A protein has these predicted regions:
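Catalytic centers of hydrolytic enzymes
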Residues: 1-140
């Protein structure tokens, strides 16, 4: 939470601005400075991740249009250039396609991909446990 905040809704950063990626193996090192925290180890299939290669990435419209400043401040892409990077867009939102998929498939059994982690774990595991207790404690 923000310094001095008493309630669970007072976090400095909103949870919807924390993304995770699928298809790559990576670590987030909380000891490194901003802009240097993420290290991509490989593609999820074990093939090398190459910084000199251009990859196609699926994003929701919020992110693709600059929401959360991940692409603008995080990647240094000017806001006015974002629309030129979109190569495909749907006419419906992600919820529509997710609901449609669930209706067709029926019961789903989601599983964690375990393709990323925070390090050093001696700091991050206790912090995650503490945060979970704080966020999901019983309302009295």
């Amino acid at each position: 939470p923000r310094e001095g905040a008493e309630d669970r809704a007072s976090f400095q950063n909103f949870s919807f601005n924390f993304d995770s990626a699928s298809g790559i193996i990576y670590t987030v090192d909380v000891t490194k400075p901003q802009g240097e925290k993420i290290t991509i180890t490989s593609m999820a299939d074990g093939s090398p991740f190459r910084m000199d290669k251009i990859y196609k990435v699926a994003l929701n419209s919020y992110r693709g249009n600059g929401g959360g400043e991940l692409l603008t401040k995080g990647s240094g892409i000017p806001q006015e250039d974002l629309k030129d990077r979109i190569i495909f867009s749907t006419d419906k939102d992600l919820r529509f396609y997710l609901m449609n998929y669930i209706e067709k498939k029926g019961t789903m059994n989601p599983k964690a991909l375990n393709q990323w982690k925070f390090v050093p774990e001696k700091w991050t595991v206790p912090a995650a446990q503490r945060d979970s207790e704080y966020l999901f404690r019983s309302v009295q």
